[in-house]
């Protein structure tokens, strides 16, 4: 057998006829397979031993040579070589075709490759290949044109007219001749000139033709090789034929397909010898073409070839394609030996690094090891006897098994493996029974529970694999979540409840208020039953008495030494914070020790507490009735407003929903308050929810409050709430609505899980070759990071954003001038605290987005590896980790809907504006008008405010030590008070002395306001925290008059642009502007002053409700028309996941906004073809046209000044526009913020760098906009590094470099355009990828992980990297000894 040497790259090309003959060991001439009597292969048939090798080991066909000593001899009687039968897996044959045929991949797939080369349509090409039309090859001196198609009649007429002076023919021969006659160089230069002439308007077809021609030129393939004269026959063992029990045969479909080809080929050869009539020969040639098509790709044909049971036969292409194809089924997903699976049960007695392995299972898994030890110990002398002993399960076997599994790690895996923590290594401990025992704390990483989950066990065999399992995969080495660095091994459920109970405080119990000298005395008192666990006591700690509880003393006593005293009630979050803290301060070994102690304590005290739930624990607030009655009154008022026509139907619906959401929230707060007070906080239901052990506020609300609003199948909220709770019981209608919601939850879960899985698969595919390859790429670019706030609320602190990254710039202390952080220094937790102390709120850090490493990323730009809390190692597969970090929560979140049972969750909008902090209003921006009691914003506006952190009356100050407007940081002396004490600053901010007050304030911040907001404060006012400063309508956007005058309608015509609807419920007439767009009509409202001049004009969008009449007088601040907000939808990741999908696929949103391309002045123009033309006049007086659909609500008015990137109308932002108008960095920030927003709303924390890795891959390519002297084609999309490389070469030779613009490509498209053709082919569209790769003669450098898995190499990451392979261990002996 041929041995494949270790290789570094793979090339794919089109096989030439000579190459196919070269591969072959002989021609297959007959379609027979096996002789039915002898069951031996037929000579010259599809299984012929002379061609493909012997079926019996070291024996020829006739039996003349029978032994390994004749190896390599070819028998003189039967011509069969004496060799191993395994050669039948690798020897190929061939079929000499009687007529050329085209390869289906190159002519049938869109775009047809042969069609592009010859510039003929796919249908014309088909008609030539299937012998329906002639094509003119050489017109000679006739009127015919080259490549002209002629049907039978036209051909006969031309022959009669011109005789033999022209050459025309049909079938694959004709196409072959045309392809042979092509001059690729000449064609290429001709097309390039055409491309330059076309300039801006890139012709896609031209670009495709040029790319194919260039590919043929570079690869050395000849176009005529796409037409086949010789057909390869794959080795027989790959298309086997096996005998079944009943004497019948099962055979691979390929044999049938080959048989058809051979039969038709032989028949055609015979017909040609007999000089049969042309029409018969032609028909046979067409049939031969069809049979070869079926062999290569049966599913792509219109009429598929079916087998005996009328199912389509599986062709060569089908064997590669899809989930069941060769790539995904056999190369990327293999079944492995030395593995087993069983149900899991909890193992509370295990240590964190252990798992319980059933003895029977272990014996089977480690059988070969046991056999070897049995033979070594001379208990038996051969394998057969050893097997017998094992089957009898004698004592020696168990003793040896104990020795074998000692320190031999095993891997446990639970499907679905969504992230790398889905496979971890453990030390096996033998257990009775048949279930695998799992440590309770690793359940979270596996997402396992014990309701019948199964897990698979794998045994690492080689010492290297075992070493990796111990060092890298052991559960104790995987304490942190790679997605965000938070602990992933933490207690939950019973353990949390036990510790919560242990550390709670209770009034009036035995031993309350006693003092103890040390911990031992406390434990003694408890054991003597003279002290209650929850009693409040005083204990001497570090020389002073501390108030604590007996339970907390027990908890702290059990913790490893060196951890400071924990003096609080422990909930699940508190425990996670504690674990994080201990990990940072003391390292992983202390954490591991602590976790096992916590587990022990939690289970013990949960058992001692022995909590139960009864109906009396579910307390329904007495105030419930009052709340519900109040809500009903509010709703009656809303209905009344609706009846009067004050509000629209949509506003009524939104208001009703809002009232119920608010009522439910208030009732829940009241209920939780009552539960908290019940039994001094020892109400079991409250304890379970508050500790985070089980259940949530939302679930208790349904038990004791009210179920609340439910969602319809469509996601809309049903405005009738379920007022009952489960304790009171539901009415029939309430029960029915409930089932509706519950069913939606389950259906969503099933559908969305598949979506999230597919998202992960696409992300893995795009990022799988991103590996940390170098230490430092030397870039000087970085990204700005700052605290993410929503108004005043901090969503993500600077610490979360920047910790573990490297700084780009040097940062000095603004006061002392000393360097706090150097350039290229890692930003540690300590550094961040220092920076926050001196008031640094923004940083420029190195990021994967700006990394300039040629392949993958560098160590410095990536920063910290969160799973280890250390700088990332070279060789880390950061791309896959990124994909898993984003995909895994996607899958988790989709499963979250069904626990709440479809209860609607939507933020209830408030109509009042108040801020959490006290502040001073510095200024206002945006269009506003003065009304009698305040300021009314007629469009969106902004408040400029400064938050007040600290205030003191100046009369209480003796001496001020700082200046007005001076920046202060924590610890700086501010003033000396009247008592003579020096007061230090506890804040970072600016001093503001105003009137008789001393303030410390923040930098100026902006607060956005909606149109129609009424502000009740003035500029310069000091406003206390929580005070209402303005009101607005959350459910409608008004169009407000900015001047006084008379209303004049323009193009508002009843029946065309205006629709009058009589509301059936209220009997009122509602006037609504229609969605219909008319070229000549542009519905507007003018305001005319007393002199008859038009002083204002308002464009009315579709669906606006008119609030005024023609000719009516109007005052400043009156509402002209209203736009209703769409009805509330429930928010959960079911809405979020499709959004993430759209962002990663860079889809253009449906309801699209138009962004200003430049900064300048807005000019309204006419409506053309249903779109409104808006010009923006830039500073140079150049007009830039923007077209906006006519019915859209405009956010600008005639004459407004806008900045580039401002939204001109409402709608969603198109990421491609952001790239074009604001550039690459803005786009990266936009995508990052949008994706993070979806996850953050779900409470999922993913570090920016993971999303950054994916965005980097999406922006890998650039589009050529000027060719220069390079070989690029105008409009071509190329890799950034290829582009820079080519330009470098051209500049070196003194030529003109190419110019390119950045582009954004979605993840699916990027995966298909990836450099590695093996990776792309195993993702999607396998045959298309392979077709293009073969034409281009692509070389796969085997850089990524996927391609190496496919070809069976070690993956080039971690210990598989070349860097680590060269390490040698040497012994260094000191020569002096």
UniProtKB/Swiss-Prot annotation:
SUPFAM superfamilies linked to this entry: beta and beta-prime subunits of DNA dependent RNA-polymerase
Residues where Zn(2+) 2 binds: 777, 851, 858, 861
Catalytic activity: RNA(n) + a ribonucleoside 5'-triphosphate = RNA(n+1) + diphosphate
Gene3D superfamilies for the chain: 1.10.132.30, 1.10.150.390, 1.10.1790.20, 1.10.40.90, 2.40.40.20, 2.40.50.100, RNA polymerase II, clamp domain, RNA polymerase Rpb1, domain 3
Residues the record lists as binding Zn(2+) 1: 60, 62, 75, 78
Class of this enzyme: transferase
Alphabetical GO biological process terms: DNA-templated transcription
Highest rank taxon of the organism: Bacteria
Cofactor: Mg(2+); Zn(2+)
GO cellular component: DNA-directed RNA polymerase complex
Cofactor comment text: Binds 1 Mg(2+) ion per subunit. Binds 2 Zn(2+) ions per subunit.
Keyword Nucleotidyltransferase: yes
PANTHER family registered for this protein in UniProt: DNA-DIRECTED RNA POLYMERASE, DNA-DIRECTED RNA POLYMERASE SUBUNIT BETA
Quaternary organization: The RNAP catalytic core consists of 2 alpha, 1 beta, 1 beta' and 1 omega subunit. When a sigma factor is associated with the core the holoenzyme is formed, which can initiate transcription.
Family under the similarity heading: Belongs to the RNA polymerase beta' chain family.
The name this protein goes by in its record: DNA-directed RNA polymerase subunit beta'
Organism of provenance: Borreliella burgdorferi (strain ZS7)
């Amino acid at each position: 057998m041929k041995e494949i040497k270790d290789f570094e790259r793979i090339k794919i090309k089109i096989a030439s006829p000579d190459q196919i003959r070269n591969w072959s060991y002989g021609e297959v001439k007959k379609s027979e397979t096996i002789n039915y009597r002898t069951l031996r292969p037929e000579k010259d048939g599809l299984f012929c031993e002379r061609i493909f090798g012997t079926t019996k080991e070291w024996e020829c066909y006739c039996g003349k040579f029978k032994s390994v000593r004749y190896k390599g001899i070819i028998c003189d009687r039967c011509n069969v070589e004496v060799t191993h039968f395994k050669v039948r897996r690798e020897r190929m044959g061939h079929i000499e075709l009687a007529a050329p045929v085209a390869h289906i991949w190159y002519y049938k797939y869109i775009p047809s490759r042969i069609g592009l080369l010859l510039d003929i349509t796919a249908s014309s090409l088909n008609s030539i290949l299937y012998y329906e039309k002639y094509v003119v090859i050489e017109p000679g001196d006739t009127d015919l044109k080259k490549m002209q198609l002629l049907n039978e009649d036209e051909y006969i007429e031309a022959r009669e007219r011109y005789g033999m002076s022209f050459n025309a023919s049909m079938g694959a021969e004709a196409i072959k001749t045309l392809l042979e006659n092509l001059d690729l160089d000449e064609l290429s230069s001709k097309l390039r000139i055409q491309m330059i002439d076309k300039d801006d308007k890139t012709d896609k077809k031209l670009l495709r033709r040029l790319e194919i021609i260039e590919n043929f030129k570079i690869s050395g393939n000849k176009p005529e090789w796409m037409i086949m004269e010789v057909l390869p026959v794959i080795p027989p063992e790959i298309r086997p034929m096996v005998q079944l029990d009943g004497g019948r045969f099962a055979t691979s479909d390929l044999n049938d397909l080959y048989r058809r080809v051979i039969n038709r080929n032989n028949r055609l050869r015979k017909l040609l010898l007999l000089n049969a009539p042309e029409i018969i020969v032609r028909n046979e040639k067409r049939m031969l073409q069809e049979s070869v098509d079926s062999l290569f790709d049966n599913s792509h044909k219109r009429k598929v070839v079916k087998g005996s049971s009328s199912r389509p036969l599986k062709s060569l292409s089908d064997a590669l394609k899809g989930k069941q194809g060769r790539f995904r089924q056999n190369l990327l997903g293999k079944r492995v030996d030395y593995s087993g699976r069983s149900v899991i049960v909890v193992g509370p007695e295990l240590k964190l690094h252990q798992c319980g392995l059933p003895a029977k299972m272990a014996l089977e898994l480690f059988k070969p090891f046991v056999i070897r030890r049995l033979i070594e110990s001379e208990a038996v002398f051969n394998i057969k006897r050893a097997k017998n002993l094992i089957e009898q399960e004698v004592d020696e076997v168990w003793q040896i098994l104990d020795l074998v599994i000692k320190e031999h790690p095993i891997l446990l895996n639970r499907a679905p493996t969504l992230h790398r923590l889905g496979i971890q290594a453990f030390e096996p401990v033998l257990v009775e029974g048949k279930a695998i025992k799992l440590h309770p704390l690793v359940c979270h990483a596996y997402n396992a529970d014990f309701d019948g989950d199964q897990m698979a066990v794998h045994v690492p065999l080689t010492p290297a694999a075992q070493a990796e399992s111990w060092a890298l995969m052991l559960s104790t080495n995987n304490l942190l979540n790679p997605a965000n660095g938070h602990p992933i091994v933490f207690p939950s459920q019973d353990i949390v409840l036990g510790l919560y109970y242990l550390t709670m405080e209770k009034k009036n119990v035995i031993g309350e208020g006693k003092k103890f000298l040390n911990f031992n005395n406390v434990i003694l008192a408890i054991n003597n039953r003279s002290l209650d666990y929850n009693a409040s006591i005083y204990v001497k700690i570090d020389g002073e008495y501390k108030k604590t509880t007996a339970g907390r003393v027990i908890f702290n006593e059990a913790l490893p030494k060196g951890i400071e005293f924990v003096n609080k009630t422990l909930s699940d979050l508190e425990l996670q914070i504690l674990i994080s803290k201990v990990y940072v301060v003391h390292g992983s070994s202390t954490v591991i020790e602590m976790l096992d102690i916590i587990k022990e304590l939690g289970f013990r005290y949960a058992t001692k507490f022995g909590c139960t739930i009864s109906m009396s624990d579910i307390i329904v607030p007495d105030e419930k009735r009052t709340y519900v009655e109040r809500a009903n009154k509010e709703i009656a008022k809303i209905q009344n407003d609706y009846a009067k026509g004050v509000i629209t139907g949509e506003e009524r619906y939104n208001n009703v929903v809002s009232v119920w959401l608010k009522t439910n929230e208030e009732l829940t707060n009241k209920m939780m308050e009552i539960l908290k007070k019940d039994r001094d906080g020892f109400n079991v239901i409250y304890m379970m929810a508050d500790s985070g052990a089980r259940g949530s506020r939302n679930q208790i609300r349904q038990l004791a409050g009210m179920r609340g609003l439910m969602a319809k199948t469509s996601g809309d909220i049903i405005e009738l709430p379920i007022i009952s709770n489960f304790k009171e019981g539901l009415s029939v209608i309430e029960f029915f609505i409930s089932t509706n919601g519950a069913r939606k939850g389950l259906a969503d879960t099933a559908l969305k899980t598949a979506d999230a899985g597919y998202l992960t698969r696409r992300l893995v595919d795009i990022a799988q070759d991103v590996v940390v390859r170098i230490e430092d790429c030397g870039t000087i670019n970085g990204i700005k990071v700052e605290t993410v706030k929503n108004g005043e609320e901090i969503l993500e602190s600077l610490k979360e954003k920047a910790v573990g990254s490297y700084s780009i710039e040097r940062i000095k202390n603004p006061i002392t001038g000393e360097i706090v952080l150097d350039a290229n220094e890692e930003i540690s937790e300590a550094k961040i605290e220092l920076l926050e102390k001196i008031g640094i709120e923004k940083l420029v850090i190195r990021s994967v987005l700006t990394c300039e490493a040629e392949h993958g990323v560098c160590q410095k730009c990536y920063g910290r590896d969160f799973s280890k809390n250390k700088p990332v190692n070279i060789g880390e597969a950061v791309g896959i980790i990124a994909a898993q970090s984003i995909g895994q929560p996607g899958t988790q979140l989709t499963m979250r809907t069904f626990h709440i049972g479809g209860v609607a969750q939507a933020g209830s909008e408030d109509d009042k504006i108040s801020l959490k902090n006290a502040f001073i209003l510095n200024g206002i921006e945006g269009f506003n008008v003065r009304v009698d009691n305040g300021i009314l914003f007629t469009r969106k506006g902004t408040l400029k405010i400064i938050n007040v952190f600290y205030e003191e009356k100046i009369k209480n100050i003796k001496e001020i030590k700082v200046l007005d407007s001076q920046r202060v940081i924590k610890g700086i002396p501010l003033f000396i008070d009247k008592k003579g004490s020096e007061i230090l600053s506890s804040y970072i901010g600016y001093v503001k002395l105003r009137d008789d007050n001393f303030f410390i304030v923040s930098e100026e911040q902006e607060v956005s306001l909606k149109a129609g907001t009424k502000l009740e404060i003035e500029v310069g006012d000091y406003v206390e925290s929580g005070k209402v400063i303005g009101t607005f309508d959350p459910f409608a956007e008004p169009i407000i008059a900015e001047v006084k005058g008379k209303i004049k309608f323009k193009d508002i015509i009843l029946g065309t642009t205006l629709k009058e609807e009589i509301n059936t419920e209220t009997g009122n007439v509602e006037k609504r502007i229609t969605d219909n767009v008319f070229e000549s009509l542009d519905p507007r409202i003018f305001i005319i002053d007393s002199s008859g001049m038009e002083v204002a004009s308002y464009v009315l969008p579709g669906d606006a409700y008119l609030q005024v009449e023609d000719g009516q007088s109007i005052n400043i601040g009156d509402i002209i028309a209203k736009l209703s907000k769409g009805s509330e939808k429930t928010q959960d990741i079911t809405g979020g996941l499709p959004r993430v999908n759209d962002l990663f696929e860079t889809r253009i949103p449906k309801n699209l906004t138009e962004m200003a391309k430049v900064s300048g002045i807005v000019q309204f123009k006419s409506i053309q073809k249903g779109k409104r033309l808006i010009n923006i006049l830039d500073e140079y007086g150049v007009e830039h046209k923007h077209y906006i659909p006519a019915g859209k609500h405009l956010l600008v008015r005639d004459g407004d000044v806008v900045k580039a990137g401002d939204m001109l109308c409402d709608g969603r932002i198109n990421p491609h526009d952001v790239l074009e108008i604001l550039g690459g960095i803005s786009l990266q920030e936009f995508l990052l913020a949008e994706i993070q927003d979806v996850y953050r709303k779900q409470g999922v924390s993913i570090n920016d760098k993971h999303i950054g890795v994916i965005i980097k891959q999406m922006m890998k390519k650039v589009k050529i906009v000027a060719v220069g002297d390079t070989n690029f084609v105008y409009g071509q999309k190329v890799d950034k590094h290829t582009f820079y490389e080519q330009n470098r070469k051209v500049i070196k030779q003194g030529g003109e470099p190419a110019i390119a613009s950045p582009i954004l490509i979605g993840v699916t498209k990027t995966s298909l355009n990836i450099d590695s053709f093996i990776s792309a082919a195993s993702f999607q569209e396998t045959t298309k990828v392979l077709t293009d790769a073969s034409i281009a003669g692509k070389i796969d450098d085997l850089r990524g992980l996927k391609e190496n898995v496919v070809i069976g190499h070690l993956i080039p990451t971690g210990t598989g990297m070349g860097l680590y392979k060269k390490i040698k261990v040497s012994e260094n002996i000191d020569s002096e000894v």
